[in-house]
């Protein structure tokens, strides 16, 4: 469990005690963020998604940020030395766990080659299998 607070554009949003926190782009919204209770986001969306992982309060919810928003995370408490930091599913081997992390949209875009098919057709067949016309 970790304790952290997060701010958007300098405004404190919440102090959270949870198993972790996920920040994601639209591309990652159908992965771990979705399983933690986050929404499915259209691939054209340029902002960030923030999802607390198993928070210890029912009031902690996913938050969708715009492309110009800056997310600041500050990890608190005694458990920070036991926390792991992952980037795209890969653990980052850092000498020490950072106490502050800033997330914002980069200057350059990354293009992904998709396996074909319409995004919403794929969403419908994958996540809403019982839906028939």
Where are these regions (language model features)?
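Catalytic phosphate-donor-binding core of small-molecule kinases
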Residues: 1-18, 22, 30-133
């Amino acid at each position: 469990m970790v304790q952290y607070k997060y701010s958007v554009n300098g405004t404190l949003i919440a102090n959270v005690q949870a198993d972790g926190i996920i920040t994601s782009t639209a591309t990652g919204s159908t992965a771990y963020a979705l399983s933690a209770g986050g929404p499915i986001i259209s691939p054209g969306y340029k902002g960030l998604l923030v999802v607390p992982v198993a928070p210890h309060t029912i009031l902690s919810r996913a938050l969708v940020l715009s492309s110009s928003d800056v997310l600041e995370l500050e990890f608190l408490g005694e458990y920070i030395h036991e926390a792991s930091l992952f980037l795209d599913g890969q653990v980052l081997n850092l000498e020490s766990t950072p106490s502050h992390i800033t997330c914002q949209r980069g200057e350059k875009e990354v293009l992904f080659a998709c396996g074909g098919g319409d995004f919403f057709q794929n969403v419908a067949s994958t996540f809403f299998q019982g839906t028939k016309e």
